[in-house]
From Swiss-Prot:
InterPro entries: DNA/RNA_pol_sf (IPR043502), Domain_X (IPR024937), GrpII_Intron_Splice-Mob/Def (IPR051083). Nuclear-encoded maturase required for splicing of group-II introns in mitochondria. Involved in the splicing of mitochondrial COX2, NAD1 and NAD7 transcripts. Necessary for mitochondrial biogenesis during early developmental stages. This is Nuclear intron maturase 2, mitochondrial. It comes from Arabidopsis thaliana (Mouse-ear cress). It is found in: Mitochondrion. Residues 161-460 form the Reverse transcriptase domain. Residues 1-12 form a transit peptide. Disruption phenotype: Low germination, slow growth, and late flowering, as well as partial sterile of both male and female gametes. Small, pale and round-shaped leaves. Impaired splicing of mitochondrial group-II introns-containing COX2, NAD1 and NAD7 transcripts. Abnormal mitochondrial mor-phology, including low-density cristae. The keyword Transit peptide applies. Keywords: Endonuclease, Hydrolase, Intron homing, Mitochondrion, Nuclease, Transit peptide. One of its GO terms (cellular component) is mitochondrion.
Length: 735
């Protein structure tokens, strides 16, 4: 009995165009199968067609699989964006949608938002696959223009902390969610982070060096150091308040400011929709306010399981000391963390206009020994400390400088008041024309340096000093004379400090501030309370780091805090007065107040057994314990550390730098650091003077005089041999 064998497989036919075409056919070859000697032919036949069938059946990679989209690390991708923008800062950004498609940026944004939400870093390997799929759906909705800002019920991805089942909510709860103020949705914060990662490198490479707020690496301390260095010698100051810009601007102006540097439709439309979409807010009416029952003692509050932990008391107290210039943060629509960046984008045109005015206004005097170069920078270093600000020459030096911190500006003018008034008039016209803001002379007051200018809770004033000048006159006579000089003083405002303490209910009274007990720490132990206040005092000392009266202001803060805690302990432990608290707990409140003789074991024994908590005394109880003011020099071309690193990396990456290094090595030779150090040590030990002094003595032999070290009356032959060895070492060391 015969059996037939059929195979369904592809044949490749050769067409006249020399291209292969797959054709499926039904093959029947009974004699081939029936012949037992044709087994090798059947094997060759099947081995030829089976791999082709498997290759065709194999599917392409799934584009919706998150694992296939994570090809690169998100941090390295961000670093690449920063390098590209700092390499070509003037290039218009056109293709930002390609970065918006990169799933690595979305995962990095998810990690950052989760860190802010949960208080702990979430590694990429710990992210669940369901979260990655939801994150991919969010990315696709943004790319397909299906994403809506401020959604309250329809989410592509939810916070890991959010366990609410929105499908089973009642109508009353749904109405409350839709009509009352709610925190920013988790998915909105992720989209904001992605946009910030894309836009921040573009604008940070273009922003002016005169703006300092809402930018990485530029803090209020940076502004104070810039003022101390660059504003010395200015007589008139124009202080402006443009904080109205932080409340919001017209959408058309914001979009036009963005499109000066960014020409990507997808990104622009996404930001425009965030600005246009209304934010749902609710105001509690007077009749709906709940009546608060006053308690004699504060009730201890227990946090819910899913409730985020609030800021510690010391940090909340320090935030109450925020100056007026830094106490306001912009919130534009649904932009969230993008709002500060958009504020700087809009105000960057003001910075550029002021830079042009500063450059055109500068006219140095021929007799001016500080500002005598074309750019206006002082070659002698810091002009306010320790050098003295010089008086101008007969033709009077004209100079101006400008800084901006958020919506507040400060302009220093060296010249007549008429120049400052002219500048103020031009500034009012520019702001009215560009930003549609009506400013008057009250918003831009002109003040003299002798009255003191308040900026960032520090007072800028001029201090007269009488130094002793010593110089050598003709004939070698040393003359000492008393001179007169002026210094720019940056002093912390004690009046503003008292105002902040009064606002936080730490003191009462105007002329003689009286500390009040801080009952917020009533339920805390003495050790915990002292620890909290020590952190606050340490942070305050760091905030006033560059103030000339740092010791005085920090010691005053320590006095207020110490008196407040003493009154708290007197009420808590029923000691009636602060004097008894200081008697039992010492001046710095370091001794435990619960310890009483004859009623409990000694405190040291409890501490040794680990049954008691050590009590740290308050810091800065004496003025001598407060750190000194930081007068470290500030460079004129200062940049943040990350910008210096980027610029240095780009410089080293250029082929021109490598060619210069090769040429230098060919001309000068190569000396290892070990050889150079050993040569320095050898010459120092042999000659008992450093290498740089040896070079000076070699170049200028008349400075040797009658020194016994180089006495020419010594053995000439021995000195000749030593000089030959020393010259060889000097040649290598200089190379």
């Amino acid at each position: 009995m015969r059996r037939s064998f059929s195979v369904l497989g592809p044949y490749k036919w050769l067409k006249p165009s020399s291209t292969y075409t797959n054709v499926y056919c039904f093959v029947t070859n009974p004699p081939l199968i029936s012949n037992p000697n044709n087994g090798s032919a059947i094997f060759r036949y099947l081995s030829y067609f089976a791999p082709q069938q498997r290759r065709q059946q194999q599917q392409a990679p799934d584009p919706d699989d998150p694992a296939n989209l994570l090809k690169e690390d998100g941090v390295s991708l961000c670093s690449q964006m920063w390098l590209e923008n700092f390499k070509e800062p003037d290039k218009t950004a056109t293709n930002l949608t390609s970065y918006l498609r990169r799933f690595e940026l979305w995962v990095l944004a998810y990690q950052k938002v989760c860190c802010d939400e949960l208080g702990a870093y979430v590694p990429r390997s710990s992210i669940q696959r369901s979260a990655l799929e939801n994150l991919l759906a969010l990315r696709n909705s943004v790319l397909d223009d299906r994403f809506k800002w401020g959604s309250r019920l329809d989410f592509y991805i939810k916070s890991p902390r959010d366990k609410t089942d929105y499908e089973s909510l009642s109508k009353r709860k749904i109405k409350a969610i839709l009509t009352t103020t709610q925190p920013t949705p988790f998915q909105d914060r992720i989209v904001q982070e992605v946009l910030l990662m894309i836009l921040e490198p573009i604008y940070e490479s273009r922003f002016s060096q005169k703006s300092f707020a809402f930018r990485p690496g530029r803090t209020a301390h940076t502004v104070l150091r810039v003022i101390r260095r660059n504003f010395a010698g200015y007589l008139w100051y124009v202080k402006g308040d443009l904080s109205v810009v932080l409340d919001g601007m017209k959408v058309g102006f914001v979009i036009s400011s963005l499109m000066r540097d960014v020409r990507d439709k997808k990104v622009i439309d996404l930001i425009k929709s965030a600005l246009v979409t209304p934010v749902v807010t609710s105001k509690v009416e007077d009749g709906e306010k709940k009546k608060t029952k006053k308690r004699k003692y504060q009730k201890k509050r227990v946090l819910a399981e899913d409730e985020p932990k609030p800021d510690p008391y010391w940090l909340e107290t320090f935030f109450g000391f925020a100056p007026e210039e830094a106490g306001k943060s912009p919130q534009w629509g649904h932009c969230g963390i993008l709002s500060p960046l958009l504020v700087n984008v809009c105000l960057d045109e003001l910075d550029r206009w002021m830079e042009t005015k500063v450059k055109d206004f500068y006219r140095p005097s021929k007799s001016d020994v500080i500002w005598n170069n074309p750019e206006g920078e002082a070659d002698q270093g810091n002009t306010s400390w320790p050098e003295f600000v010089p008086t101008s020459g007969p033709d009077k030096t004209r100079k101006m400088d400008y800084v901006r911190y958020g919506g507040h500006i400060l302009i220093g003018v060296r010249g007549p008041r008429a120049d400052a008034a002219t500048l103020r008039k031009e500034l009012i016209e520019f702001v009215d024309q560009k930003y549609m803001l009506r400013l008057d002379n009250e918003n831009l007051p002109i003040e003299h340096i002798t009255k003191g200018i308040m900026f960032l809770d520090h007072v800028l004033c001029r201090r007269v000093v009488y130094p002793t000048l010593r110089y050598t006159a003709t004939g070698g006579k040393i003359i000492s004379e008393k001179g007169v000089g002026t210094l720019l003083s940056v002093t912390a405002s004690l009046k503003q400090c008292i105002k902040q303490f009064r606002k936080l209910l730490f003191i009462k009274g105007d002329r003689d501030p009286d500390p009040q007990p801080c009952f917020r720490m009533f339920h805390a132990t003495q050790a915990h309370t002292n620890n909290q206040m020590n952190k606050f005092l340490t942070t305050i000392a760091e905030w006033y780091r560059f103030a000339d009266n740092r010791k005085k202001i920090v010691n005053f803060c320590s006095y207020i805090i110490r008196g407040s805690l003493a009154k708290l302990y007197a009420a808590k432990y029923k000691l009636r007065s602060r004097a008894k608290v200081y008697k039992f707990a010492n001046r710095n409140l370091s001794l435990p107040l619960l310890q009483k003789k004859g009623q409990s074991p000694e405190y040291q024994n409890l501490l040794r057994m680990g049954l008691a908590e050590s009590v740290d005394g308050l810091v800065y109880t004496r003025m001598s314990l407060v750190p000194e003011t930081d007068y470290s020099p500030f460079p004129g071309n200062w940049r943040p550390e990350h910008e210096k690193f980027l610029i240095e990396y780009l410089t080293l990456d250029e082929p021109k730098t490598l060619e210069e290094q090769k040429r230098f090595i060919r001309e000068k030779g190569l000396v290892s650091p070990q050889d150079y150090t050993s040569m320095l040590v050898w010459n120092y030990k042999r000659n008992a003077i450093p290498m740089d002094q040896v070079s000076i003595l070699k170049d200028q032999p008349f400075l040797l005089g009658s020194s016994s070290t180089y006495n020419r009356d010594n053995d000439d032959q021995k000195n000749k041999e030593e000089d030959e060895d020393s010259e060889d070492g000097l040649r290598i060391a200089r190379m």
